[in-house]
Amino acid sequence: MIWLDITDPKYVLFFKGMLPLLKKIDEVIITTRGNEDYSETHRLLELFKIEAYCIGGYGGASKLGKLQARLQRQNGFLSLFERLGKTPQIFITGASVEGVQTAYGLGIPVINFADTPIAGHIFSLQALTILSRLTLPLSSLVFHPFVVPAQCYEALGVAKENIIAYEFIDVALWLRDLKKGKDFREELGLDSSLPCILIREEEYKAHYVKEKLPIIYESVHLLSSSLNANLVIMPRYGSEGLIKEFGGLNNVHILEKKLDPSEFYPYIDLLIGGGGTMNLESCYLGIPTISTRSLFLYHDIYLLENRLMHHAKTPQEVLFFARNILSKLTPPVPNAHLFEKEKAGFEKIVETLKQRFFTPN
């Protein structure tokens, strides 16, 4: 039995293409987490009709809350395996401390997909994230995208032969063949003749983000009063606070449901992103992108060096870039060649797993 713990939305999209290959090897079970303020991952699994056991929830921003949630989930995993009457042969994850520690404690090999080992873009031991410190040393095998140096993983004691780079950036897996889906603007009742700006909050509760900055929210107010455009906010943790702050603005709309990428990317003219994954997605698709995030990771530097993205430090800079972009819109041209040194896929990765963990000695 192969066990995956999928704990954030990015890894739903990431592992979706891997599941059919894994199911050819052995039975696969998937666990996830979800609660009222953090249901995006669970809803995305449901959207793609991926069956999963929902074990525990998200602990929030506090250290105590995170620890309590992890302990509850670990007990939940043990109860699940007891109900199933069997223990997994391998464990696969992208960002699950409790999954890694449960698997390690049970003697289950840990396969880790890790793309954010440090909180920054220049290596130092001090920059290693809490997530990395709690998971990578317990990993039997670590896979990472080519833009992140192997040094980040070696520093935590992972042997060189157990660190494997793949020659693509994750978002290429699910965006390469993106087709136009149902136009989300119709459901929101937006005027399709106006430019459409999608806005994504920073992952301010994440382990590698030090504080919640106001720039993205101040930018919404400034853009709303300065541009004749549709502003659509995609919440990260919950919509209640956003509705309270922006609900009275006629040209600001807040998404309440989870959408497939095919339903919104083909219909937006600009992405303003405080996070990482959606900035990468829009840059891959050739959509103009403004980053407001509070720190640079290796991926951000790669996008900036290749002139795929702007970075703004103030709402005024956001407005400047937005006006300039909207004044000379052209059809987006995908940048696949910068994201795929070789065709994105899981075939080589799954073959490695078969050889290492499922081939009789």
List PLM regions with ranges:
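Donor nucleotide-activated moiety binding/catalytic core segment of transferases
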Residues: Q72-F81, G238-M278
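A donor-sugar binding/catalytic signature common to diverse glycosyltransferases
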Residues: I90-T102, N112, E263-I301
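C-terminal amphipathic helix plus adjacent low-complexity
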Residues: L329-N361
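Catalytic donor nucleotide-activated moiety binding site of glycosyltransferases and closely related
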Residues: F48-E51, I55-G60, G65, I199, ...
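Conserved nucleotide-sugar phosphate-binding/catalytic loop shared by glycosyltransferases and other
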Residues: I6, D26-A69
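A nucleotide-sugar donor-handling region in carbohydrate enzymes
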Residues: S139-K212
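A conserved, positively charged/aromatic
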Residues: N112, A119-F143, Y265
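Catalytic binding pocket for nucleotide-activated donors in carbohydrate/polymer assembly enzymes
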Residues: Y284-T330
